[in-house]
């Protein structure tokens, strides 16, 4: 599968950002991505993460016959594999030009620089020597493979332990880790590669380019150096012409970066060795326990927020006031009106109206009480007319009369009827007077 090319818009955007000294991940020109080193349960196994670029390093050893021209030296072998798991553009089982170039650069950086004492790998001169094999697997590709691979290779070699051997006459005895402690390799120094990407024919420079920056770069300069500022190898690719001052400046930057990376490697090795001695938990499972599959991880980028408030005030002062926007337009036509439009708010007058109603209610109660205070004779007359209400001097009957709401009205109606209609005795007396006359 071929690599997806960048569009013209993306290319122009990246180049313009580089001209303005800006990078997509928020780094500065000479900033490296975060480096994370984790070790496996076995010696010589590690994973190095350079940003999102991941490389797995594994070191193994075996006893073999030495080379004819170097009978007293061991053998170092490096192998870098680019699988489709890292990027779809990599083809499995095929030696691409990129893979060949990376393997050669690793051999020059680690084997030709004599960072490992190969004579200490000899067991019997001319017969048995140790062959150290370093296998590097690219797990994820996000640019700058050579830097991540060189760090993974040197970390795996420093972490590796070979079995102990003893020679008695012609007999060679190989001891297991349970019988004797494994022996570490003799390492003189740690060469580390630092990559520099050039743009616009060497006008602009970036350290540790990522995958998108590598697509638009014009040339690449790789400098392998140790913490003693000794250059192990240097390689330029891309066909650009570099000035002597540019190479010197890159070498100074590489010296600073290599010193920082070497210190990080030594701290990681010391921490792993201390955990193993104390009997604590170690391995890949412990190193990635916090990064669960279902969890999201967000990398924070530093942002300068010193002048944000001042700029915000300036923008607000310069901005024009927004026009008034009617959320719901109303169309006024003849014969239409809106309830509550133009009327004063009367919510505060509710208390006064409630007080007035209470006062009126008190007046009605006094009137009802006055009406109930009637003569006993009149009440007896009402009862003689067939009314069901009978009053007496007892307090219980008076309370029964006052409790219902309609009883006072009935009393009023009956009293008014008695006043208008004369009694039967009065009617008989009037008839007698008329007959006498």
Swiss-Prot record:
CDD domains xref list: RNase_PH_RRP45
Recorded GO CC terms: cytoplasm; cytoplasmic exosome (RNase complex); cytosol; exosome (RNase complex); nuclear chromosome; nuclear exosome (RNase complex); nucleolus; nucleoplasm
InterPro entries: ExoRNase_PH_dom1, ExoRNase_PH_dom2, ExoRNase_PH_dom2_sf, Exosome_comp_Rrp42_subfam, PNPase/RNase_PH_dom_sf, Ribosomal_Su5_D2-typ_SF, Rrp45
GO BP terms, alphabetized: exonucleolytic trimming to generate mature 3'-end of 5.8S rRNA from tricistronic rRNA transcript (SSU-rRNA, 5.8S rRNA, LSU-rRNA); mRNA catabolic process; nuclear mRNA surveillance; nuclear polyadenylation-dependent rRNA catabolic process; nuclear-transcribed mRNA catabolic process; positive regulation of cell growth; positive regulation of transcription by RNA polymerase II; RNA catabolic process
Subunit and partners: Component of the RNA exosome core complex (Exo-9), composed of EXOSC1, EXOSC2, EXOSC3, EXOSC4, EXOSC5, EXOSC6, EXOSC7, EXOSC8 and EXOSC9; within the complex interacts with EXOSC3, EXOSC4, EXOSC5 and DIS3. The catalytically inactive RNA exosome core complex (Exo-9) associates with the catalytic subunit EXOSC10/RRP6. Exo-9 may associate with DIS3 to form the nucleolar exosome complex, or DIS3L to form the cytoplasmic exosome complex.
Record-listed cross-link Glycyl lysine isopeptide (Lys-Gly) (interchain with G-Cter in SUMO1), residues: 297
Family to which this protein belongs: Belongs to the RNase PH family.
An MF annotation (GO) of this entry: RNA polymerase II-specific DNA-binding transcription factor binding
Phosphoserine carried by residues: 65, 306, 346, 392, 394, 407
Basic residues bias locations: 426-437
Localization terms from the record: Cytoplasm; Nucleus, Nucleolus; Nucleus; Nucleus, Nucleoplasm
Record's protein name: Exosome complex component RRP45
Post-translational modification N6-acetyllysine, affected residues: 297
Region of interest (Disordered), ranges: 339-437
Record key words, sorted: Acetylation, Cytoplasm, Exosome, Isopeptide bond, Nucleus, Phosphoprotein, RNA-binding, rRNA processing, Ubl conjugation
Purpose: Non-catalytic component of the RNA exosome complex which has 3'->5' exoribonuclease activity and participates in a multitude of cellular RNA processing and degradation events. In the nucleus, the RNA exosome complex is involved in proper maturation of stable RNA species such as rRNA, snRNA and snoRNA, in the elimination of RNA processing by-products and non-coding 'pervasive' transcripts, such as antisense RNA species and promoter-upstream transcripts (PROMPTs), and of mRNAs with processing defects, thereby limiting or excluding their export to the cytoplasm.
Polar residues compositional bias, start-end: 413-425
Taxonomic source organism: Rattus norvegicus
Biased composition (Acidic residues): 349-363
Cross-link Glycyl lysine isopeptide (Lys-Gly) (interchain with G-Cter in SUMO2) residue location(s): 297
């Amino acid at each position: 599968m071929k690599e997806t090319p960048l569009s013209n818009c993306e290319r122009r955007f990246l180049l313009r950002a580089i001209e303005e000294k800006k990078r997509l991940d928020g780094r500065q020109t000479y900033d490296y991505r975060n480096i994370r080193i984790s070790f496996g349960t076995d010696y010589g196994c590690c994973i190095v993460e350079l940003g999102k670029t991941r490389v797995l390093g594994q070191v193994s050893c075996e006893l073999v016959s030495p080379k004819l021209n170097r009978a007293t030296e061991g053998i170092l072998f490096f192998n870098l594999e680019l699988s489709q798991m890292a990027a779809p553009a990599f083809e499995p089982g095929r030696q691409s030009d990129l893979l060949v170039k990376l393997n050669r650069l690793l051999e020059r950086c680690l084997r030709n620089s004599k960072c490992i004492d190969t004579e200490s790998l000899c067991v019997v001169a001319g017969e048995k020597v140790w062959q150290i094999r370093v296998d590097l697997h690219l797990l994820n590709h996000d640019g700058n493979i050579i830097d991540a691979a060189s760090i993974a290779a040197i970390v795996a070699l420093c972490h590796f332990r070979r079995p102990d051997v003893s020679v008695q006459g012609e007999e060679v005895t190989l001891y297991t880790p349970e019988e004797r402690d494994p022996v570490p390799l003799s390492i003189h120094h740690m060469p580390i590669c630092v990559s520099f990407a050039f743009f616009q024919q060497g006008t602009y420079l970036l350290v540790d380019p990522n995958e998108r920056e590598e697509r638009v770069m014009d040339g690449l300069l790789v400098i392998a150096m140790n913490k003693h500022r000794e250059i192990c190898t240097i390689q330029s690719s891309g066909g650009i012409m570099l000035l002597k001052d540019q190479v010197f400046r890159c070498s100074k930057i590489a010296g600073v970066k290599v010193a920082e990376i070497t210190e990080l490697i030594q701290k990681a090795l010391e921490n792993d060795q201390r955990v193993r001695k104390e009997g604590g938990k170690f391995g890949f499972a412990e190193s990635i326990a916090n990064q669960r599959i279902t969890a999201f991880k967000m990398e924070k980028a530093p942002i300068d927020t010193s002048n944000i408030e001042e700029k915000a005030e300036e923008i607000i002062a310069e901005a024009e006031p927004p026009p008034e926007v009617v959320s719901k337009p109303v169309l006024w036509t003849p014969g239409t009106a809106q309830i509550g439009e133009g009327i004063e708010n009367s919510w505060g007058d509710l208390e006064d109206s409630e007080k007035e109603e209470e006062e009126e209610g008190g007046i009605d109660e006094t009137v009802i009480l006055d009406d109930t205070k009637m003569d006993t004779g009149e009440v007896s007359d009402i009862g003689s007319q067939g009314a069901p209400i009978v009053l007496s001097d007892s307090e219980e009957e008076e309370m029964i009369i006052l409790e219902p709401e309609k009883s006072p009205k009935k009393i009023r109606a009956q009293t008014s009827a008695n006043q208008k209609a004369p009694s039967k005795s009065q009617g008989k007396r009037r008839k007698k007077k008329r007959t006498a006359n």
